[in-house]
Design a protein with these regions (language model features):
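Surface-exposed, low-hydrophobicity beta-strand/loop segments enriched in small/polar/acidic residues
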Residues: 2-142
Length: 142
């Protein structure tokens, strides 16, 4: 059996000028942005911008999605203008969704660069949607 350390734990234990932890990885302040949208025949391909504009350097920890059954064959993905599925690939919303947090590995801990990734976007696919969508964005800033 081995005792090993994660990459950031190693940097924490032996900090140098070349391996300093970036902002928010240890001791950052967790922030929460809660938002909702009441869809009324929202058309396929529409986007819903949620939460506040994220600052350069913020790290997205998770994005939680809950919604009513929005309509036959509908889906929602969670991302931004740079990647529509950065935080969650299309999840079926034909039935109600309760607290979906299936964030892909590349999206967990994603550092906002300030290019096209400062606003969280939900993208509707598969058909028109009617119902309530609720989103909670957890992110870290220094």
């Amino acid at each position: 059996m081995s005792a090993v350390y994660g990459a950031n734990r190693t940097k924490y234990l032996d900090p140098t000028t070349t391996n300093t932890l970036s902002r928010g990885l240890f001791g950052g302040k967790l922030r929460v942005a809660v938002d909702s949208y009441e869809a009324s025949t929202l058309t396929n391909g529409s986007t819903i911008a949620v939460g506040q504009t994220l600052a350069i350097g913020d790290k997205v920890v998770a994005v939680l999605l809950s919604c009513d059954a929005l309509g036959t064959s509908t889906t929602l993905s969670i991302g931004d203008a740079g990647s529509a599925t950065r935080y969650q690939a299309a999840v079926s919303t034909q039935s109600a969704v309760a607290g979906s947090i299936a964030i892909p590995a590349d999206g967990m801990g994603y550092t906002v660069t300030g290019t096209d990734d400062t606003i969280i976007l939900l993208t509707l696919g598969g058909g028109n949607a009617t119902g309530t969508v609720k989103v909670t964005v957890l992110y870290v800033k220094e």
